[in-house]
Amino acid sequence: MRDTIRTALCCMVIAPGTLWAVVRLGGLERGPLVQLLAFTPYVAAWSVLPAVVLLALRRWWLAGVALLVAAALAGAVLPRAVGSAASGGGVSLRVLTANMQFGAADAGALVDLVRERRVDVLVLQEYTPEAEVGLRAAGIDAVLPFHRTRPLPKASGSALFSRHPLAEDGVRENPGHFTQAYARITLPGARPVSVESVHTTPPAHLDNLNYWRRDLAIQPAASGDTLRVLAGDFNATLDHAALRALVSRGYRDAAAATGVGLSGTWGPYLGRNGRKPIPPITIDHILADSRIGVGEVSTHALPRTDHRALAAELFVPAIQG
């Protein structure tokens, strides 16, 4: 009887990790599981503990299951910390994306970061009329004189600033009603590249999930003659099947490709009155066309926003002949 109880308790220890691995590897996230899947890297780290405990207790077959679960989660997560992409040749394009949190981000600090990182293209989400005034006053036009913006109240606005002239530029609205500024940019000696400021509906409520999936699904694929870069707040991590499906359409995640894909870009978030502590997660991304090389990728703190800015140096294929 006691042995049966101990076995049942041991099964309970490995059950959460096992179910998590099944959902993650099977792309089965539904309802509130969508939010939970963002924390898969933390669960992957925790999953080693049950295996160690069960080995110490000599529960060999249960320990074997726990080790398989830990290995499966590690296989899903660790490649982001290793990287595999070589930068290759091409013309340098430095991209910076930042969510301004209802336009409150420190405009002066953002422009300073643009100068420091020698940014060629800046894409912004939650771009408000107040943010536009602040950036103009901070001197954004002197650094990135070409722009396409749609300042809107609260979280719906979008902006794209560039060191180089824009063509075929515009702003589109997602099903979830956030806007996305986009433009084709031509660097001297390089093929044209289309850059878009991505902002999808957050899956913070069950009512938003359909919009979230649709927002991700309608992002343009990287195919044909047009080189593409999608950068912004995707409100999804690489543990979400919907984002992995987008990446599979001709992109690679710049941070994951260079081994910094576990760097948190949102949080830690304390919630209202500090009662809901949420650890950092990686929901901001720069997705580069797989034909574009990827160099250094880094995150940067910005005052007055709960997102970190994400910077990447990309290498656009040169014009041949």
Residue map of PLM features:
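N-terminal export and membrane-targeting signals
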Residues: 1-12, 55-64
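Membrane-embedded alpha-helical segments of integral membrane proteins
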Residues: 8-54
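Transmembrane helix-loop junctions in multipass membrane proteins, especially transporters and channels
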Residues: 28-29, 59, 85
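Glycine/proline-rich, flexible active-site/cofactor-binding loop segments
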Residues: 40-70, 176-199
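N-terminal signal-anchor transmembrane helix
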Residues: 56, 64-116, 133
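Soluble catalytic domains of enzymes that build or remodel membrane lipids, polysaccharides, and related
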Residues: 95, 101-115, 124-321
